[in-house]
Swiss-Prot record:
Enzyme nomenclature, EC number: 7.2.2.12, 7.2.2.21
Function summary: Involved in cadmium/zinc transport.
Presequence positions on this chain: 1-17
Organism per entry: Arabidopsis thaliana (Mouse-ear cress)
Transmembrane segments: 123-144, 154-173, 181-201, 203-223, 362-384, 399-416, 738-757, 763-781
Resulting phenotype, residue 53 to S: In strain: cv. Landsberg erecta
Domain of life: Eukaryota
NCBIfam families, per the entry: ATPase-IB_hvy (TIGR01525), ATPase_P-type (TIGR01494)
Chain intervals with Basic and acidic residues compositional bias: 66-79
Family matches, as PROSITE patterns: ATPASE_E1_E2 (PS00154)
Primary subcellular site in the record, as a coarse category: plastid
Chain positions covered by the region annotation Disordered: 66-87
Protein name: Probable cadmium/zinc-transporting ATPase HMA1, chloroplastic
Membrane topology: Multi-pass membrane protein
């Protein structure tokens, strides 16, 4: 089956980038945004760029010139490598515009004295941060382990060596933020740490910075876990392909080949590529020679290996398990399935949900409020609560308490609350489900109704032609004086015309007609021109149709629904006769019907479709566990629609719908029922309804490009079992996000209150604060697990699992007793 063309939705967020000759950019990790960096500037502004290497919080500052990105490179390989460089570091970094004059001056000064280079070095070596933390801990235990005369000297030595390891980069970060008018978590922590030093508590200040860095290293580890599937996909993307050299138009032969290794992005459509055992198919292609056993588990989650033989379509990224084959590229690297999956998943991570957008706006203002409150406590505390301004042996001072509030109230835990969205997106990608943004999960969780298209969605879409029946305008008889069209010839003529009109179509009815015509002795029909009417049918001018009395000539042919064909007849009496003939058909009403009209002769094409395996279970799950209102929206007639509906368990059916009717039904039902509506389809006829629905879901393997473009969720597997998974995952994600926000606020309160009251030291405040942040991260990672509808369902599944194991255990016991 041909892989889907994953078309980027026009609704996807685009990130503007300012242009300027002397624009200074500060690229660093922002705890309130997780966006992929993009370097799309056509000018060459000076900027500070970020490179995240081993330590997740290590941000490399350097002055570079932006890459001229207009795709006119002299060396394509260099361009390709440049892309991979940015992809490698793009999971959790964002470029912040830093155009203020103070920032430029500060950076120039820092660069001149080597501050930038030293900060880069310290950030890139994780062991230095760990060493600093170890030195601070050693200084803390010196009073208990070291001889008394050496305590002060050892503590000073540890502090002098350890503090610069964490303080150099922290001070540069904070000063750059302050110079740009930013007040964030880095500024708050740096202020608290250096204020502690000036107050004589250098040990606590050092511990604060060390624990902050280590905690955020752990935080970034959990954040990177959410992107692990995308990374694996990108790593499985081959860098090169074995391009077969074709000389003088000769057809390549698998037994005698001449090939060379070329960069994968240089493989053109129509090129021949050799794929051996263990290799990855570089681009979407068609097997030309040979055969192989392939797996696409990492693309769609489909575990079962597939056999690929000549003529089969294979998606880029498929792994060749066994065999050797020549494939012909059908798409370039940029348009191939694997690259599109990576693109869509990365864009889904970058399309921020409502909560994260709110946190982006809230974060900076919140940090400023924390600074104001801290200053108020520092200066008003001595007057209101009789605290000393600086700490004494008997009481912690107001400045110390203010620093504790500054640390405890930092919004780190709130900032990582949306991490649950990232884990959900990766979990869906692992199952072969692509979401066009985290906001889709919020929308999906709010839906109370789900509507399914019938043909190709609830059914296999593999329609089979059962009969061709002339019903109107055909003359029969043996009298030679009457212009006759004997029935066998009419059936052949009708099939030939219909197959010619539907050649190359993706519609299930059209595919069934074309498949039925293969291998049959049919007259040659040529389509001169045609016009398509979405959801109704098509008309064409055909050549090659002959009668007994005359040679072939151009004739008008129409193919589509009964209503479409009857609407083309001017006489109401003729339309009624055709409808009566359809109702009186000896084949009954349960089949799917298509009608063909050629010069007022109408032929009925009877087709049969079967429900997909497992669809009834999906519908039952959506009804009983998801509590969704389930309905069918189809363009088929009522008897065919109800036959499928009864088979799968749907009790609400709307049939004989044109695309505009489906669109209106979606709008009206969503408005009347309240809440959102999910539309599941795959054809171009479903595109308007998919676009109007709260969430549109398509089966990507057989969907039209239009349906894919407007859909919010793409199911890469060719079944709808992913629909209940999506609904359950959305509800799990919204629940996790709510839990994260509650945990974040609780951790802030529990760390801030005792700190302001003077019950805990500054280093313990940091520990409580960062502990809350790590707790939120750990809770978010739960989103990588499969969701469940409720704890009751978990218990039912556990009981069923135990019951299924009982016969096995009893039989094993009987065998052992027999021995």
């Amino acid at each position: 089956m041909e892989p889907a063309t994953l078309t980027r939705s026009s609704s996807l967020t685009r990130f503007p980038y300012r242009r300027g000759l002397s624009t200074l950019r500060l690229a660093r990790v922002n705890s309130f945004s997780i966006l992929p960096p993009k370097t799309l500037l056509r000018q060459k502004p000076l900027r500070i760029s970020a490179s995240l290497n081993l330590p997740p919080r290590s941000i490399r500052l350097r002055a570079v010139e932006d890459h001229h990105h207009d795709h006119h490179h002299d060396d394509e390989q260099d361009h390709h490598n440049h892309h991979h460089h940015h992809h490698q570091h793009g999971c959790c970094s964002v470029e912040l515009k830093a155009e203020s004059k103070p920032q430029k001056m500060l950076f120039g000064f820092a660069k001149a004295i080597g501050w930038v280079r030293l900060a880069n070095y310290l950030r890139e070596h994780l062991h230095l941060c760990c060493s600093a933390a170890a030195m601070f801990l050693a200084a803390a235990v010196c009073p208990y382990l070291a001889p008394e005369p050496y305590i002060k000297s050892l503590q000073n030595a540890f502090m002098i060596v350890g503090f610069p390891l964490v303080g150099v980069s922290a001070s540069l970060d904070a000063l750059m933020d302050i110079a740009g008018g930013k007040v964030n978590i880095h500024v708050l922590m740096a202020l608290a740490a250096f204020a502690s030093v000036f107050m004589g508590n250098a040990l606590e200040g050092g511990l604060l910075l060390a624990m902050f860095n280590l905690a955020h290293i752990a935080e970034e580890f959990f954040t990177s876990r959410s992107m692990v599937d995308v990374k694996e996909l990108k790593e499985s993307n081959p860098d090169s392909a074995l391009l077969i050299e074709v000389h003088n138009g000769n057809v390549p032969n698998i037994s005698d080949l001449s090939y060379k290794s070329v960069p994968v992005h240089s493989v053109e459509v129509g090129s021949y590529v050799l794929v051996g055992t263990g290799e990855i198919v570089p681009v979407d292609c068609e097997v030309y020679q040979g055969s192989a056993t392939i797996t696409i588990e990492h693309l769609t989650g489909e575990v079962k290996p597939l056999e690929a033989k000549a003529g089969d379509r294979v998606p880029g990224g498929a792994r060749n398990l066994d065999g050797r084959m020549i494939v012909k590229a059908t798409k370039a690297w940029n348009d191939s399935t694997l690259n599109k999956i990576v693109q869509l998943t990365e864009e889904a991570h970058s399309n921020k949900p409502k909560l994260q957008r709110w946190l982006d706006e809230f974060g900076e203002n919140y940090s400023k409020v924390v600074v104001v409150l801290s200053l108020a406590i520092a200066f008003l505390g001595p007057f209101l609560f009789k605290w000393p301004f600086l700490s004494t042996a008997a009481c912690r001072g107001s400045v110390y308490r203010a620093l504790g509030l500054m640390v405890a109230a930092s919004p780190c835990a709130l900032a990582v609350a949306p991490l649950a969205y990232a884990t959900a997106i990766s979990s869906c990608a692992r199952k072969g489900i692509l979401l066009k943004g985290a906001q889709v999960l919020d929308a999906l969780a709010s839906c109370h109704t789900i509507a399914f298209d019938k043909t190709g969605t609830l059914t296999t879409g593999g329609l089979t032609c059962k009969a061709i029946e002339p019903i109107y305008g055909h003359q029969g008889g043996t009298n030679s004086s009457v212009i006759t069209c004997c029935i066998p010839n009419c059936e052949k003529e009708a099939l030939a015309v219909a197959a010619a009109m539907e050649k190359g179509t993706t519609h299930p009815i059209g595919r069934a007609v074309v498949d039925h015509s293969v291998g049959k002795d049919l007259p040659s029909i040529f389509v001169e021109s045609f016009e398509y009417f979405p959801g109704r049918g098509l008309t064409a001018t055909v050549n090659g149709v002959k009668t007994v009395a005359e040679e072939s000539r151009l004739r008008k042919a129409s193919l589509g629904s009964i209503e479409f064909i009857t609407s083309l007849f001017k006489s109401e009496d003729e339309s009624k006769q055709i409808k009566d003939a359809v109702n009186a058909s000896s084949y009954g009403k349960d089949f799917v019907h298509a009608a063909l009209s050629v010069d007022q002769k109408v032929t009925l094409i009877h087709l049969e479709d079967q429900p997909r395996p497992g669809v009834s279970g999906v519908i039952a799950e959506l009804k009983s566990w998801a509590r969704l209102r389930v309905m069918m929206l189809t363009g088929d007639h009522d008897s065919s629609a109800w036959r499928v509906a009864n088979a799968v368990g749907i009790t609400e059916v709307y049939c004989n719908l044109k695309p505009e009717d489906k669109l209106n039904h979606v709008k009206n039902i969503a408005r009347e029922a309240g809440g959102g509506l999910i539309m599941v389809g795959e054809g171009i006829n479903d595109a308007p309804a998919l676009a109007a629905a709260t969430v549109g879901i398509v089966l990507a393997q057989r969907a039209s490009a239009t349906a894919i473009a407007v859909a919010d969720i793409l199911l890469l597997r060719d079944n709808i079992t992913g629909v209940p998974f999506c609904v359950a995952k959305s509800r799990q994600t919204t629940s996790l996000v709510k839990q994260n926000v509650a945990l974040a606020l609780t951790s802030i309160f529990l760390a801030a209150l005792p700190s302001v009251l003077g019950f805990v030291p500054l280093w313990l405040t940091v520990l409580l604060h960062e502990g809350g942040t790590l707790l939120v991260c750990l809770n978010s990672v739960r989103g990588l697990n499969d969701p469940s509808w409720s704890w009751k369902q978990d218990i039912v599944h556990l009981i069923n699992k135990l019951r299924s194991q009982e016969p096995t255990s009893s039989s094993s016991n009987s065998l052992s007793s027999a021995h």
